[in-house]
Regions:
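Winged-helix/helix-turn-helix nucleic-acid-interaction surface
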Residues: 62-101
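Short recognition helix of helix-turn-helix/winged-helix DNA-binding domains
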Residues: 1-53, 82
Length: 101
């Protein structure tokens, strides 16, 4: 069973869906977080597969990934320009709480 940090449900959902008006970004984040937890490593997935998994268009998946990278909620690496990206889910709220705590 996938376990989510309380922040993901209590704050991040409201922030991405309500404030940013980017519900697809939230769905993509959830999918990547769950897959990263299952695999215990960054997730390698194409835009097409990501879009199909979430149930949106490929362009919506691309926009969601770009927004999540902009918000520093995921990071992306590639072996080369045409390679399938590897996405690592980030939890910046944990780093912030450690600095202030």
């Amino acid at each position: 069973m996938v376990k989510l940090d309380e922040y993901v449900l209590d704050s991040l959902m409201r922030d991405l869906v309500g404030h940013d008006r980017r519900p697809v970004s939230y769905l993509v984040y959830l999918l990547l977080a769950a897959e990263q937890q299952r695999q215990n490593k960054p997730v390698s997935i194409s835009y097409s597969d990501l879009a199909e998994s979430v149930g949106v268009s490929k362009s919506s998946a691309q926009s969601a990934v770009a927004w999540l990278i902009h918000r520093k909620l995921i990071s992306s690496t590639k072996a080369n320009v045409t390679a399938t990206p590897n996405y690592a889910v980030q939890t910046p709220w944990k780093a912030n709480s450690q600095r202030t705590g």
